């Protein structure tokens, strides 16, 4: 499937320190070590509604990582999926009296437009689950052949499940205890009470065909894939075993990322599906997580339709640290709009203070677990000096403008 158009990224002189990120599995900030080509997979949207600021904050996080890698001179192989086979999509389509494929196409196109507006760099491969059925079936066949999966004893609906004990290391990614896993599994799409399962935490790989649901033919019977195996199969096909970063929102730590890692590890015998597991915090409104199910969404398209500059939306989301759960508000947006106006005024000056030190500080802060609050504060200090005292460097404004564009994705 076609991705969206890429915004140009200015090339900067020099470089910054090695990128260090918090790894969910290791529970610490540590260096991100890659080869000449850095590999990253980020879980994409389920396209049944418009992009809200919680989505945007997640994809901005991995856009920052992409930009730090480009600044370091790396090639980046970035893959993102679209979960266009999932119950929420089918339920929304049924509610609205629309074909689920048409709904998915419409919302995916809106998402692409939102990402373009926010100047999020596109993935090299942007992959629908429906485009990946063959590789999903192949992966399930491998798990069945190895004993990592089984078919439940149900003549009517012989679903295929993953054995949670198929790998010795299951649970390392989240670090959760069994009680927490069981609770989250039930809350986030699992089916612990399904009769015939060997373990209540065994995850669905293939849902046998039901009346009124889309299905595809497979050697183990017609049906459709489970959620987690879609991502496992796409990663193995597009990037191979052992990627540098698997990413998404913190609500994907368990069960989704734990299981997608375990599925791949069960057939590759690798100890770690990804060298870094990176998760972005949740965005709230009025004290609650912003979510489609709660209905408290602030949508990117809604803000831009009101005339809000997408650069201000981006700055507002970058004002908080990516791992922190944080709230969006009218005050956050107003602060971002004021900051954007000051920055644009400063870089347009005919002369300003030297850009060298502030660019170095921004690089250093971003390399330290994407510390955007301090990076933005460093730029604020330069802007304050430029507006108050001017300077003697005629090239400084353009240099800061290019650095803000290249490293933060904000166009001044």
From Swiss-Prot:
Which branch of life, at top level? Bacteria
Give the EC number. 6.3.1.13
- Motif 'ERGGDP' region located where? 187-192
Enumerate the cofactors the protein uses. Answer: Zn(2+)
- Describe the reaction catalysed, as an equation: 1D-myo-inositol 2-amino-2-deoxy-alpha-D-glucopyranoside + L-cysteine + ATP = 1D-myo-inositol 2-(L-cysteinylamino)-2-deoxy-alpha-D-glucopyranoside + AMP + diphosphate + H(+)
Annotated residues that bind L-cysteinyl-5'-AMP are located at: 43-46, 58, 81-83, 227, 249-251, 283
Molecular function terms, GO-annotated = ATP binding; cysteine-glucosaminylinositol ligase activity; cysteine-tRNA ligase activity; zinc ion binding
Residues the entry annotates as binding Zn(2+):
43, 231, 256
Q: Which residues form a coiled coil?
A: none
State whether keyword Ligase applies: yes
Motif 'HIGH' region — list its residue ranges.
Answer: 45-55
- Keyword ATP-binding part of the UniProt annotation: yes
One GO cellular-component annotation of the UniProt record comes to: cytosol
- Swiss-Prot/TrEMBL keywords: ATP-binding, Ligase, Metal-binding, Nucleotide-binding, Zinc
Q: Name one GO biological process term.
A: cysteinyl-tRNA aminoacylation
Q: Where is this motif: 'KMSKS' region?
A: 289-293
Q: Which Pfam families match?
A: tRNA-synt_1e
Q: How is the cofactor bound?
A: Binds 1 zinc ion per subunit.
Could you say which protein family the record assigns here?
A: Belongs to the class-I aminoacyl-tRNA synthetase family. MshC subfamily.
Which HAMAP family does the UniProt record give?
Answer: MshC
Question: Which PANTHER family does the UniProt record give?
Answer: CYSTEINE--TRNA LIGASE, CYTOPLASMIC (PTHR10890:SF3), CYSTEINYL-TRNA SYNTHETASE (PTHR10890)
**Subunit structure, interactors included:** Monomer.
What is the role of this chain? Catalyzes the ATP-dependent condensation of GlcN-Ins and L-cysteine to form L-Cys-GlcN-Ins.
What name does UniProt use for this protein?
L-cysteine:1D-myo-inositol 2-amino-2-deoxy-alpha-D-glucopyranoside ligase
């Amino acid at each position: 499937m076609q991705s969206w158009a890429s915004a140009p990224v200015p090339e900067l002189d020099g470089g910054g320190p090695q990128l260090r990120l918090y790894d969910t599995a290791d529970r610490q900030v540590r260096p991100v070590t890659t080869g000449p080509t850095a590999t990253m997979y980020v879980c994409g949207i389920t396209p049944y509604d418009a992009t809200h600021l919680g989505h945007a904050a997640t994809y901005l996080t991995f856009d920052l990582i992409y930009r730090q890698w480009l600044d370091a001179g790396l090639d980046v192989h970035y893959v993102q999926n679209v979960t266009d086979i999932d119950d929420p999509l089918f339920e929304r389509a049924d509610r609205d009296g629309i074909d689920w494929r048409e709904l998915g196409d419409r919302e995916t196109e809106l998402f692409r437009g939102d990402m373009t507006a926010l100047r999020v760099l596109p993935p090299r491969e942007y992959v629908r689950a429906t485009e990946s059925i063959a590789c999903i079936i192949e992966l399930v066949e491998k798990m069945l052949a190895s004993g990592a999966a089984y078919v439940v004893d149900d003549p009517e609906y012989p679903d295929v499940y993953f054995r949670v004990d198929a790998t010795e290391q299951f649970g390392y990614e989240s670090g959760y205890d069994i009680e927490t896993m069981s609770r989250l599994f039930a809350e986030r799409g699992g089916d612990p009470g399904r009769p015939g399962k060997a373990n209540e935490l065994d995850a669905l790989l293939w849902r046998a065909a039901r009346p009124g649901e889309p299905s595809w033919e497979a050697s183990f019977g017609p049906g459709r894939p489970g959620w987690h195996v879609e991502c496992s199969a796409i990663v193995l096909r597009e990037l191979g075993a052992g990627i540098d970063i698997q990413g998404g929102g913190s609500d994907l730590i368990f069960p989704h990322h734990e299981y997608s890692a375990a599925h791949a590890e069960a057939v590759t015998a690798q100890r770690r599906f990804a060298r870094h597991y990176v998760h972005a915090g949740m965005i709230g409104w009025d004290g609650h997580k912003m979510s489609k199910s709660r209905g408290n969404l602030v949508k990117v398209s809604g803000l831009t339709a009101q005339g809000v500059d997408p650069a201000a939306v981006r700055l507002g989301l970058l004002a908080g640290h990516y791992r922190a759960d944080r709230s969006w508000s009218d005050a956050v947006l107003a602060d971002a709009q004021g900051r954007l106006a000051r920055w644009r005024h400063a870089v347009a000056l005919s002369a300003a203070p030297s850009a060298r030190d502030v660019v170095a500080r921004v690089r250093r802060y971003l390399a330290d677990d994407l510390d955007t609050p301090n990076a933005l504060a460093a730029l604020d200090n330069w802007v304050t000096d430029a507006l108050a005292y001017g300077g003697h460097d005629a090239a400084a404004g353009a240099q800061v403008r290019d650095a803000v564009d290249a490293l933060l994705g904000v166009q001044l």
